[in-house]
From Swiss-Prot:
GO terms for molecular function: structural molecule activity. Residues 1-22 are annotated as: Disordered. The keyword Protease does not apply. It is found in: Virion. One of its GO terms (cellular component) is virion component. The keyword Ligase does not apply. This is Core protein VP3. InterPro entries: Inner_layer_core_VP3_Orbivir, Inner_layer_core_VP3_Reovir. Belongs to the orbivirus VP3 family. The gene is Segment-3. The VP3 protein is one of the five proteins (with VP1, VP4, VP6 and VP7) which form the inner capsid of the virus. Keywords: Virion.
Length: 899
């Protein structure tokens, strides 16, 4: 981040920045909170991080991350095109009626991904996930405004949209064959159909089976209309609007329900909060996202200064602790502590305060005593949640006792108890028992939760996981708050008891001050209640089941997945926080889009979980290629291809450096999902990828000595007409009795004995086949019209190297190398001699591959268009395809069309 222009200018008073705290927004406070939390992380982990790897703990830009997530919501995972991909192309040979038909999907898929190495399982995982994403991307298209032509009064499909490229073969066909092809093309009639009361074009074309499955799944998703999901989302948004006191407009509904509109809903509301909260080490990241997306912008308002002037400082000479601090000015660090206090009040239980170890302040009796009094009125310590730690509660008890006892005379009688604990005494003529103010987390005694119900369940909340309503000081957040009148005549148990105790101790001036501060104090907590129960209510809010056990676990010292964040504050900052109230001035700018941000985040997390579940199965399916694989490998592979904003949110507190295998496997096994279009297509892509040959990966690679054909050219015309070619692709696997299975153990044993080459040579001489393990290999497809390079012809299905070092011979053998399926097309001229293709020494090829897919076929002219058997649905040009996902916002008015 660049420094401000005046960064180099010396400041005469570098700490007096009180006015800078006047306005805090949600994103600003989220960055501040993240800075403070990361400071605690640094301190807590500094001891053992010195002995482990270095971790970058820089503070990320939360606003930039959220903007990235919003951009994800605006992206469409499908393409709107006017013609499908060319799925089949033809390679012309010298024959006039025979050609090679190539499935271009397998050609493109063979070029995706890197070379697989059995010693680097991370590369294998990355290759698989890249191929799956490539498949999903190719099949996710919607046809719109397809080109057509008129033929004898009928609408005929343009050849470009049929998915078969016949342009390359037309020049070499006879007139009879060209007429036959043209007749077939003229028969590609466009039919009229109806999808969800919308008129569409229907025609038959060609498409690779894998791509068509993705396309068909996407089309089924669109044809299902998602009407119930949309109604549920609108109903839920209206509920959320009532909870957050925002208006949800339905004006856009009249826009996309017109008869000329096809609308698509890619996400669903509400987001499943379990998906968000089951991510490993997610508590801090979700807390920061809750602050950034929901916390309103506000100002820190001070009370009327006359309250102090007519009570604490009414005399010319004022030497009491409160009077001394009344005119003090906070420093920048102390104002930061005020921010921490209000963050802790807005996130009870999640953020807990503790006192800094500051010998200078601890020795200042005035600061400690004042903080001890106002701390009991600012914080809650049980019975349902707490804002402070046990240590801080005890220190505040001691400070309160010191204030009550620092100056008393014979008129103020004090009777000490037997235990010697803080506040174990009776004071005043009425002998007020100060033991009642000693901290008791089971009853909330001595603090704001004392004698009242500060957590309640009312009407069902929009988010199922957060049904609690916070009631600080027994204030109902639904009440209308007017600062001029609210709080007058109101009270609650702890405040009343504090006034009674102060009067009993002879602190009449301080009691008068607190009595006059009560309306200001009630307005403060009324605002906080509203912020917690309305603005901060989101999927990033901590679930009730985890919130309810925070206090009990803290008291018992039990460690759970969701532990509170402890922030340190100074003694005097408690006084400054008491004299300032957070007054919201405007709602968070991202409040209306927060539900969409949550849904996008949950959807991406679900897709990542599906990917990791499928990756976890690979090691069991193909152990030979994943001998050294660990769960961290597929975790990193999926993270590598996931959107950057989602990775940034998950790693907002740099927790990925400390996630272990147990965290990963536990998350992968949890069943919670967030439905979305991306999830539907991802699941279908993995269903296709269960057959790994669809990803151009195979374990059916054999070593077999075969002679490259060298035919005699006795009849050149017939040879050309046959369309002669050679390939190392097998039509079927060899018979099992002729195949020798070479596992890693067998190969290493023979290599260590120095007999591997000899053993393989003996098998080749006996015309046997060798299969090297069950390792998956990447398969490439190449075509040649002349002799292929020697490195392809002589390639072996394994890598074997020997080296000598220190008098010892070392052998290295690897199976997972790239395999090439090649097609050699023989071209001859009429001037060639009969033995033009014959060599003195034959050429041997050693690698054979079997894939149970029709990648290349030799077909006749009549079969060239026989693959047009897939039904396509295309939306008419005058129809609008509208993605209404962006309309799922509180307060939105219009859905923007994508076409």
């Amino acid at each position: 981040m660049a420094e401000p222009p005046d960064a180099a200018t010396p400041k005469t008073s570098p700490y007096l920045k009180g006015d800078e705290l006047s306005s805090d927004s949600g994103p600003l406070l989220s960055i501040f909170a993240l800075q403070e939390i990361m400071q605690k992380v640094r301190q807590a982990k500094s001891e053992y991080m010195a002995a482990t790897k270095d971790v970058d703990l820089t503070i990320p830009d939360v606003q930039k991350i959220i903007d990235g997530v919003k951009e994800l919501a605006s992206e469409t995972i499908y393409k709107v095109v006017n013609k499908p991909l060319i799925s089949y192309r033809h390679i012309v040979m010298q024959s006039r009626d025979r050609f090679l038909r190539v499935d271009t999907y397998y050609e493109r898929m063979s070029e995706v991904g890197d070379k697989i190495d059995e010693n680097e399982p991370a590369k294998f995982y990355e290759t698989v996930i890249k191929k799956v994403r490539h498949l999903r991307t190719e099949g996710a298209f919607v046809l719109h405004n397809i080109p057509t032509r008129d033929h004898r009064g009928m609408e005929i499909a343009d050849p470009e949209i049929l998915g078969v490229d016949v342009k390359s073969i037309l020049p070499v066909l006879t007139a009879e064959h060209r007429a036959m092809v043209q007749h077939i093309l003229d028969g590609a009639i466009i039919e009229n159909g109806i999808v969800a009361t919308r008129d569409v074009d229907v025609y038959f074309g060609a498409c690779s089976e894998s791509v068509y499955r993705i396309y068909n799944r996407l089309q089924g998703y669109i044809e299902a209309v998602q009407l119930e999901e949309l109604r549920a989302a609108i109903t839920w948004l209206e509920r959320l609007g009532r909870r957050k006191r925002m208006t949800f407009s339905q004006e856009f509904l009249t826009d996309f329900r017109r008869a000329d509109t096809i609308w698509v809903l890619a996400l669903q509301l509400p987001a499943n909060p379990r998906v968000i909260w089951q991510v490993p080490r997610c508590s801090i990241a979700n807390l920061i996202m809750n602050i950034a997306t929901c916390l309103p912008t506000g100002e820190y308002v001070s009370p009327n200064p006359r309250i102090a002037s007519i009570t604490l400082t009414q005399r010319i000479t004022t030497t009491g602790p409160f009077a001394i601090l009344t005119g003090s000015t906070p420093t920048a660090q102390q104002l930061d502590d005020v921010r921490k206090i209000y963050l802790a009040l807005m996130f009870p239980g999640q953020i807990v305060l503790d006192l800094k170890i500051d010998p200078g302040e601890r020795m200042d009796p005035a600061v400690r005593m004042v903080a001890g009094v106002v701390g009991h009125l600012m914080f809650t310590a049980g019975p349902r949640f707490t804002n402070i730690t046990q240590n801080m509660a005890r220190q505040l008890d001691i400070a309160l006792a010191d204030f009550l006892l620092y100056m008393y005379n014979t008129r103020i009688q004090v009777q000490y108890g037997p235990t010697g604990e803080p506040l174990d005494f009776r004071i005043g003529r009425g002998q007020y028992d100060c033991n009642a103010f000693r901290t008791n987390f089971q009853t909330g005694a001595g603090y704001n939760g004392w004698g009242l119900v500060d957590v309640e369940n009312r009407e069902p909340a929009p988010y199922d996981h957060v049904q609690r309503f916070i009631r600080y000081c027994n204030i109902d957040s639904r009440e209308l708050i007017h600062p001029a009148t609210f709080g007058i005549g109101m009270n609650y148990y702890c405040y009343n008891e504090m006034l009674r105790m102060l009067v009993a101790a002879g602190k009449d001036t301080e009691a008068a001050f607190f009595r006059n501060m009560l309306p200001f104090h009630m307005v403060r907590f009324a605002r906080i209640n509203q912020i917690i129960n309305e603005d901060l209510h989101s999927a990033f809010s901590m679930p009730d089941d985890q919130f309810n056990v925070l206090l009990a676990n803290m008291i018992a010292g039990a460690q759970e997945r969701m532990d509170p964040v402890v922030l340190d504050i100074s003694w005097i900052s408690i006084w400054y926080a008491f004299n300032r109230s957070f007054e919201p001035t405007r709602r968070n700018e991202m409040l209306e889009s927060a539900p969409l941000i949550e849904s996008v985040y949950a959807s991406e997390l679900t897709v990542m979980k599906i990917d990791m579940q499928q990756m976890a199965l690979l090691q069991r399916r193909f152990p030979d290629v994943l001998i050294e694989a660990r769960p961290t490998h597929f975790w990193k592979a999926v993270m590598e291809v996931s959107p950057e904003p989602v990775r940034a949110i998950m790693d907002l507190a740099h927790s990925h450096s400390f996630i272990n295998i147990r965290d990963m496997m536990r998350w992968i096994g949890l069943p919670s999902m967030q439905p979305s279009m991306k999830l539907v297509l991802e699941e279908e892509a993995w269903a296709v990828a269960n057959d790994f040959e669809e990803l151009m990966l195979t374990d059916q690679v054999y070593m077999f000595r075969d002679m490259l054909p060298e035919p005699r050219l006795d009849d050149i015309e017939r040879f050309r007409q046959e369309g002669f070619y050679y390939t190392n692709m097998l039509d079927g696997p060899p018979t099992i009795d002729r195949v020798v299975q070479y596992t890693y153990e067998v190969a290493r044993l023979q290599a260590n004995m120095g007999q591997l080459r000899a053993a393989l040579r003996r098998i080749m001489d006996e015309e046997g086949w060798v299969r090297f393990g069950g390792v998956l290999r990447t398969v490439r497809v190449k075509f040649f019209d002349s002799r292929p390079p020697e490195e392809i012809l002589q390639a072996l299905p394994f890598d074997y190297q020997t080296s000598e070092k220190g008098g010892l011979t070392y052998a290295t053998i690897k199976y997972a190398n790239d395999t090439t399926i090649y097609y050699l097309i023989y071209n001859v001229e009429y001037s060639n001699l009969p033995d033009s293709l014959v060599l003195i020494n034959p050429t041997y090829v050693m690698t054979k591959v079997f894939i149970n897919k029709r990648i290349v076929e030799r077909v006749r002219v009549g079969q060239a268009l026989a693959v047009m058997n897939k039904r396509f649905i295309a939306y008419k040009g005058k129809m609008r395809i509208m993605d209404i996902t962006q309309a799922l916002k509180v307060g939105t008015k219009l859905a923007a069309p994508t076409v």
